[in-house]
Amino acid sequence: MAEYQMVVGGFLNEPLTGRRPIETPETEINRANVLKVVMGKAEPIHLLNKNEIRFLHNYYLGSQPVLQRTKEYHAEITNRIVENHANECVGFYTGYMSGTPCSYVRSETATGDGEEIARLSNALQYEGKDALDRRLWQWMLECGQGYRIVLPDKGYNGNYPDETPLLVDVPDPDMAYVIYNSGIGHKPIANVLHIPRNYQNDLNDLICVYTPNQYFEIDNGKVTKSENHSLGMLPMVEYKLNPERMGLFEPAIPVLDAINDLESNRLDGVAQFIQSIMVFTNCLVDKDALDQVKELGAMCLKSTSGLPASVSQIANELDQQQSQTLLDSMLNVYRSLTAMPSTTGSENATSDNVGAVIVRNGWNHTEARAQQYENMFKYAERQSLSVMLKILRDTAGSKLMASDINIKLPRRQYDNQQSKVQIFAQMIQQPIDPQLAFTTPGLFPDPQAAYEMSKPFLIASGKLGEDGKAPKPQEQPKQDATGTNAGNMTDKQSTDTNKETEGK
């Protein structure tokens, strides 16, 4: 099997086991120790991580070790086949996790209404957050980590929510990292961002360092700029796919390399069978005769007494059935390591119901893995949300706090939509806050926006008060035996109903 440790600009000295955390015992970074911490401790670790990240990214793009495959015998027949399953699994999970945009909804403990949250969601949508989330998920799945940076937009004109005072970006993880304190809590103490000036020489990058209150620029090993900033927190947040910062297909790389080698050898076997070696027995053939065979496809031989002349071929055909059995076994290992569902084969053409298909084809394992990724994403997204809200409070007068917002990542669009509609219809009729009916079933991609759009109808039906809030239990309109709101009946209707009841 080809060695996969070699990468552009360096070597991976160990098997890939996730990215290394960058930690320091320092509790803060300032002008006095910024060079010592960043250049002396953080950059060497980041260089190792960067080599691995670039290898994984190139692997995802199709630059895989089988392309450097060589053969000692029959070197003229050397096929190099890349079955890019790394691209397959990353593309699948990217769509599965970010196909429906991340949404913000009002939390149960929020004191205000959800209108301001809806304005925030719309404003971020105008800023392209959905596309940035997709890019962020791709980096997380490729190399186990991604970054989101949020800074005040210097071009903001005060027209929130038509425009936002937020400058949101997703830098490449090989050009950014977070420095953590190595003590209890592993608190982040600094952000480092590389600004490339010469893509052929990483050593010429401008290094930007953010602390909660200061900003530094390091150029050629010297601090060339130092100033304070008013944000009061770190602007960049690290998103980890898992605690080890290991990419989705990273554990399966040996299996993926073996699949590429097997497929390449299978094609070599077919080519060698077709282009088999000719053996001439009891006859002499010169180069001109061989050229004539290639041109005409036939030749004439003469036999002598006791020495019959013959021509045969040395051809050993590869057993394709055994090769396919081995390939299927390795594909099953790949699917197990990446929790990929089975989407091919005749086994899918059955009359099973949705639940049976989900379990049989591995979608339950996919959903369990996705739930782990979602929990890690929400943890980091809440930190990014705190930075966004801090900037909005300082520039746009927003009163939102991070505790007022719940983060939703809608998924499982293969579920039965009719069941979701039935759950929604049942919940909306119960004496509960109507917003729970919008957020619980997973029917709406943006539950908060759907709830805000439905408010006039909920008010008209008595589910919400005139102020747009759920009435208190004692204020809930009473229902008669037929389920009709008695509070909505006129005096005459109420009197007629009472007389009819007395007559009965």
What is each stretch, according to the model?
Residues 135-137, 151-152, 270-277, 344-350, ...:
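Short coil/turn segments at secondary-structure boundaries
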Residues 134-245:
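Extended, regular secondary-structure scaffolds
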Residues 49, 323-324, 343-346, 418-419, ...:
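Extended hydrophobic-aromatic, low-complexity segments
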Residues 1-167, 496-504:
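Extended, helix-rich architectural segments
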Residues 4, 222-361:
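Extended, charged amphipathic alpha-helical segments
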Residues 261, 265-279, 336-347, 379-401, ...:
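Intrinsically disordered or highly flexible coil/loop and linker segments, enriched in small
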Residues 109-114, 303-419:
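Surface-exposed loop-to-helix/strand elements on domain peripheries
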Residues 421, 425-504:
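Activation/maturation switch segments at domain boundaries
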